[in-house]
Curated annotation (Swiss-Prot):
Designated gene of the protein: GLY1
Cell compartments where the protein resides: Plastid, Chloroplast
The protein's name: Glycerol-3-phosphate dehydrogenase [NAD(+)] 2, chloroplastic
Family annotation (Gene3D superfamilies): N-(1-d-carboxylethyl)-l-norvaline Dehydrogenase, domain 2, NAD(P)-binding Rossmann-like Domain
EC identifiers of the protein: 1.1.1.8
Length: 420
């Protein structure tokens, strides 16, 4: 029997607390650590091929990173700031959580920028103006002093350079019709609302011009993985603005982008909007799976299937497949399906736990857009001749035509298919 081979002691010295492991020919050698000896990199001995390879890899990584940093600095140096400089007033329609977070963000972009929030609740209005807090949604967060609230639509919209629309989709038509007389026909609308109008299947890009009776009203959709609370806390966030007007998309990018908020641009308005709407329905499905304690395997399978369904429908509607895999698609889906801050996911969890939809909605102080949007899914599936089993199951559960348990059984018994 051959004698066992013991690795020779290598006199390697490193200054760190935990000396690294060198792996060579399946023998792992722990190097000796000495606090008194800090060698030069070139003095490290060992198998030449491994050391040279590691040095080459480190060099490649270092060069790649340095190139990236130089490229980034170069673009930042050339970035235009004229949009922010000439913007004097921004109006935010709606005093909910996301409208408040975006109002605070825009106000922090420039001192002296007037940010007007049009709110319905006079108590919230007073709280913002006197105490600089939205007492209903962010009572512990102080708003910038250049955020001003009002219940007067005419005053809020007067001389505004940009309008951020944060009214829930199902109430947007009636709300906009009520303020249409005060809206400048050239005022760009940046929609923060995600969903489909239940009776008409319209997206916000269709609702706004129809309600305002102006087919040329400038429009931008803002979407992506973004919780209002994290935006309020200045945590790193990335979103996308979509508009058929590239110049307008670039202008809104300049207006909103900051050191903690990245803004990409897109021309695919349909893709950004439909992904943002349907991900809310999928989040309800994900919540149901969690509420029923069906495990991680089923969660992954369901969300994967739901992503495919969103892609199938979106592309039939004219969206680009790449949009669905971007921030407004996959990014937003991941956030809303897997994180408990999601209102739509919370609705699903409670449905899966056995609560009734009426009890759930009565106890909530914010709108879960996916509940109403789910009702539009079946009509869209029929209109575009697309099978959407997961999203349709959610609509049936919400309409009380299917129990979560029965829905799971039906979905698991669907025909075995080839993945596409």
């Amino acid at each position: 029997m051959a004698a066992s081979v013991q690795p020779a002691c290598l006199d390697l010295h490193f200054s760190g607390k935990h000396p690294p492991l060198l792996k060579h020919n399946a023998i792992i050698v722990r190097c000796v650590s000495s606090p008194n000896v800090i060698p030069e990199a070139d003095s490290i001995s060992g198998p030449p091929d491994i050391i040279n390879t590691n040095r080459d890899q480190r060099k490649v990584v270092r060069i790649a990173w340095e190139k990236l940093v130089r490229w980034s600095r170069s673009l930042r140096a050339k970035a235009k700031t004229d949009v922010l400089e000439r913007t004097r007033k921004v109006v935010v329609l709606g005093g909910g959580s996301f409208g408040t977070a975006m109002a605070a963000h825009v106000a922090r972009r420039k001192e002296g920028l007037e940010v007007n929030m049009l709110v319905r609740d006079s108590f919230v209005c007073q709280s913002i103006n006197e105490n600089h807090h939205n007492c209903k949604y962010f009572p512990e967060h102080k708003l910038p002093e250049n955020v001003i609230a009002t219940t007067d639509a005419k005053a809020a919209l007067l001389d505004a350079d940009y309008c951020l629309h944060a009214v829930p989709v199902q109430f947007s038509s009636s709300f906009l019709e009520g303020i249409a007389d005060y809206v400048d026909p050239g005022l760009p609308f940046i929609s923060l609302s995600k969903g489909l109008e239940l009776n008409t299947l319209r997206m916000m890009s269709q609702i706004i011009p129809i309600a305002l009776k102006n087919p040329r009203q400038p429009f931008v959709a803002l979407s992506g993985p973004s919780f209002a609370l994290e935006l309020m806390n200045n945590l790193p966030t990335a979103m996308v603005v979509a508009s058929k007007d590239k110049k307008l998309a670039n202008a809104v990018q300049q207006l909103l982008a900051s050191s903690y908020l990245r803004i990409n641009t897109s021309s695919d308005v349909t893709g950004v909007e439909i992904a943002g709407a349907l991900k809310n329905v999928l989040a309800i499905a994900a919540g149901i799976v969690d509420g029923m304690n069906l495990g991680n395997n089923s969660m992954a399978a369901l969300v994967s299937q739901g992503c495919s369904e969103i892609r199938w429908l979106a592309t039939k509607m004219g969206a680009k497949p790449t949009t669905i895999t971007g921030l407004s698609g996959t990014g937003d889906i991941m956030l809303t399906c897997f994180v408990n801050l999601s209102r739509n996911r919370t609705v699903g969890v409670r449905l899966g736990s056995g609560e009734t939809l009426d009890d759930i909605l009565t106890s909530m102080n914010q709108v879960a857009e996916g509940v109403a949007t789910a009702g539009a899914v079946i009509a869209l599936a029929q209109k575009y001749n697309v099978k959407l089993p997961v999203l349709t199951a959610v609509a049936k559960i919400i309409d009380n035509e299917l129990t979560p348990t029965k829905a799971v059984l039906e979905l698991m018994n669907l025909p075995q298919i080839e993945e596409v």
